[in-house]
């Protein structure tokens, strides 16, 4: 299932949730390294996205990105937001509330182009559980909610 950022997706099944939790656990247990690796992969594959991060200006190589405290800080925030979604899979109202709030911040305060949510979600899905339809469905749920303020 490709990751989508509009419309809706079917609810996650119990089996999908179990598989997501299993795939996510080792990533989150090493969240600092995992988060930086994901964000570096995102920026090296999609350099135009970096323009929305003024603090990352001038960081042009993967090594520079990995060594940046600002990149590490933002990577941790991304990983924690995904973790909140994983933890909240059984409480979609809670997940929706948190992600809609995050959407508002990205739309109004940071003016991020929402197309990049889907690109980053694909990098996360590929890193965590490449080809797993359930994880891609969760990433779609996240992307749809992150676009809600746009």
UniProtKB/Swiss-Prot annotation:
Binding locations of heme b: 74, 106
Species this protein is from: Petromyzon marinus
Record Gene3D superfamilies: Globins
Keyword RNA-binding among UniProt keywords: no
Pfam families from the UniProt entry: Globin
Coiled coil: none
Location of the Globin domain: 11-150
Keywords: Heme, Iron, Metal-binding, Oxygen transport, Transport
UniProt superkingdom: Eukaryota
PANTHER family in the cross-refs: CYTOGLOBIN, CYTOGLOBIN-1-RELATED
Keyword Transport: yes
Any one GO MF annotation of this record: oxidoreductase activity
UniProt-recorded name of the protein: Globin-2
Sequence similarity: Belongs to the globin family.
Annotated SUPFAM superfamilies: Globin-like (SSF46458)
